[in-house]
């Protein structure tokens, strides 16, 4: 496309932004042309039979008359940084969702680890959860799992793990913990 435009001496390009379809075209053309990205709200064609050809002609006419307000497109490095930040935010949200699912499994199973540990995903709590998953329905002493810095008494922690986890909840819990650890 860039070669074809260069062949005909085209140095200005105006296009309508629609979804993410404009991005690859913009990335190619920004190196060789002055690209104006127009918001569809401001380039609405007149009423009648609409075709892509008529829309393109309309946008061209608006651009040539100076009636297209260009959208702000940051430089390439900023766009890439924004993309990475969006991805990081999505990963963080996914991690939070998985942690909420773990908490839900524990609550449904009457395992009140959040009452006795400030961090359900800390070392002591995770080791207790792991033991419960490996030995379902088995009564056990929590003492070997507790860190000496644990602020709650052994009796309080023991009472907090006095629940029963179903096979379904255990399977869900294992899967959630696997996702968190990845």
Language model features with spans:
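A detector of single, family-specific signature residues
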Residues: 1-182
């Amino acid at each position: 496309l860039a070669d074809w435009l260069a062949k005909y001496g085209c140095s200005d390009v105006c296009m309508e932004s629609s979804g993410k379809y404009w991005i690859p075209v913009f990335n190619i053309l920004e190196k060789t042309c002055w690209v104006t990205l127009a918001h569809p709200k401001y380039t609405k064609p007149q009423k009648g039979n609409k075709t892509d050809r008529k829309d393109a002609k309309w946008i061209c006419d608006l651009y040539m008359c100076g009636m297209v307000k260009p959208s702000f497109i940051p430089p390439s490095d900023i766009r890439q940084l924004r993309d990475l930040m969006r991805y990081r935010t999505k990963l963080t949200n996914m991690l939070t969702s998985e942690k909420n699912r773990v908490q839900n499994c524990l609550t449904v199973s009457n395992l009140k680890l959040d009452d006795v540990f400030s961090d359900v995903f800390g070392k002591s709590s995770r080791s207790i959860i792991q033991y419960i998953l490996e030995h379902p329905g088995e009564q056990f002493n929590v003492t070997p799992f507790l860190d000496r810095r644990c602020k709650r008494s052994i009796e309080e922690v023991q009472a907090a793990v006095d629940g029963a986890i179903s096979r379904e909840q255990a399977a869900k819990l294992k899967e959630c913990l696997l996702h968190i650890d990845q």
